Amino acid sequence: MRAPIPEPKPGDLIEIFRPFYRHWAIYVGDGYVVHLAPPSEVAGAGAASVMSALTDKAIVKKELLYDVAGSDKYQVNNKHDDKYSPLPCSKIIQRAEELVGQEVLYKLTSENCEHFVNELRYGVARSDQVRDVIIAASVAGMGLAAMSLIGVMFSRNKRQKQ
């Protein structure tokens, strides 16, 4: 039997499992979250929308967690509590509530929803999704370079034998 999802507490980070990425929000109580909503997170835009990669603005929204998650699974994930001390809960919520309704800068690689919630909870803007993609791309690039080098060496060796 699967363990039940723990009830979020104010100030908790909520990780929402979209089909191709993770969306992040911060729980502020009474069923509500505050999150950064680029066009891909606007109702009807489609969960797999690439619109967030094409925009530089997002709206800070306060919505019911149930509505933001929709049919996607979610979990409480305060994953950096071991590295950073969370700010006091009252400060997290105050900062989040003050931003609701504001249009803010949005960059997929440096100012996305994960950066936003980590800044609110820890005072440190970071995104592991971005880091993981950069690492994967670097590893893939090195692999392709190594394969190309092996191919060149193999073809030279083959020509020398002829």
Curated annotation (Swiss-Prot):
<keyword id="KW-0808">Transferase</keyword>
<feature type="domain" description="LRAT">
    <location>
        <begin position="13"/>
        <end position="129"/>
    </location>
</feature>
<dbReference type="GO" id="GO:0048471">
    <property type="term" value="C:perinuclear region of cytoplasm"/>
</dbReference>
<keyword id="KW-0472">Membrane</keyword>
<dbReference type="GO" id="GO:0008654">
    <property type="term" value="P:phospholipid biosynthetic process"/>
</dbReference>
<dbReference type="InterPro" id="IPR051496">
    <property type="entry name" value="H-rev107_PLA/AT"/>
</dbReference>
<keyword id="KW-0496">Mitochondrion</keyword>
<keyword id="KW-1133">Transmembrane helix</keyword>
<dbReference type="GO" id="GO:0031966">
    <property type="term" value="C:mitochondrial membrane"/>
</dbReference>
<keyword id="KW-0458">Lysosome</keyword>
<dbReference type="GO" id="GO:0070292">
    <property type="term" value="P:N-acylphosphatidylethanolamine metabolic process"/>
</dbReference>
<comment type="function">
    <text>Exhibits both phospholipase A1/2 and acyltransferase activities. Shows phospholipase A1 (PLA1) and A2 (PLA2) activity, catalyzing the calcium-independent release of fatty acids from the sn-1 or sn-2 position of glycerophospholipids. For most substrates, PLA1 activity is much higher than PLA2 activity. Shows O-acyltransferase activity,catalyzing the transfer of a fatty acyl group from glycerophospholipid to the hydroxyl group of lysophospholipid.</text>
</comment>
<dbReference type="GO" id="GO:0007031">
    <property type="term" value="P:peroxisome organization"/>
</dbReference>
<feature type="active site">
    <location>
        <position position="23"/>
    </location>
</feature>
<dbReference type="GO" id="GO:0036152">
    <property type="term" value="P:phosphatidylethanolamine acyl-chain remodeling"/>
</dbReference>
<dbReference type="GO" id="GO:0005783">
    <property type="term" value="C:endoplasmic reticulum"/>
</dbReference>
<dbReference type="GO" id="GO:0005886">
    <property type="term" value="C:plasma membrane"/>
</dbReference>
<dbReference type="GO" id="GO:0009617">
    <property type="term" value="P:response to bacterium"/>
</dbReference>
<feature type="active site">
    <location>
        <position position="35"/>
    </location>
</feature>
<keyword id="KW-0443">Lipid metabolism</keyword>
<feature type="active site" description="Acyl-thioester intermediate">
    <location>
        <position position="113"/>
    </location>
</feature>
<keyword id="KW-0378">Hydrolase</keyword>
<dbReference type="GO" id="GO:1903008">
    <property type="term" value="P:organelle disassembly"/>
</dbReference>
<keyword id="KW-0442">Lipid degradation</keyword>
<dbReference type="GO" id="GO:0004623">
    <property type="term" value="F:phospholipase A2 activity"/>
</dbReference>
<keyword id="KW-1003">Cell membrane</keyword>
<feature type="topological domain" description="Cytoplasmic">
    <location>
        <begin position="1"/>
        <end position="133"/>
    </location>
</feature>
<dbReference type="GO" id="GO:0008289">
    <property type="term" value="F:lipid binding"/>
</dbReference>
<dbReference type="GO" id="GO:0005778">
    <property type="term" value="C:peroxisomal membrane"/>
</dbReference>
<dbReference type="GO" id="GO:0006644">
    <property type="term" value="P:phospholipid metabolic process"/>
</dbReference>
<dbReference type="GO" id="GO:0016410">
    <property type="term" value="F:N-acyltransferase activity"/>
</dbReference>
<keyword id="KW-0812">Transmembrane</keyword>
<feature type="transmembrane region" description="Helical">
    <location>
        <begin position="134"/>
        <end position="154"/>
    </location>
</feature>
<dbReference type="GO" id="GO:0005764">
    <property type="term" value="C:lysosome"/>
</dbReference>
<dbReference type="GO" id="GO:0005829">
    <property type="term" value="C:cytosol"/>
</dbReference>
<dbReference type="GO" id="GO:0005777">
    <property type="term" value="C:peroxisome"/>
</dbReference>
<dbReference type="GO" id="GO:0005737">
    <property type="term" value="C:cytoplasm"/>
</dbReference>
<comment type="similarity">
    <text>Belongs to the H-rev107 family.</text>
</comment>
<dbReference type="GO" id="GO:0016746">
    <property type="term" value="F:acyltransferase activity"/>
</dbReference>
<dbReference type="GO" id="GO:0005789">
    <property type="term" value="C:endoplasmic reticulum membrane"/>
</dbReference>
<dbReference type="GO" id="GO:0046485">
    <property type="term" value="P:ether lipid metabolic process"/>
</dbReference>
<keyword id="KW-0576">Peroxisome</keyword>
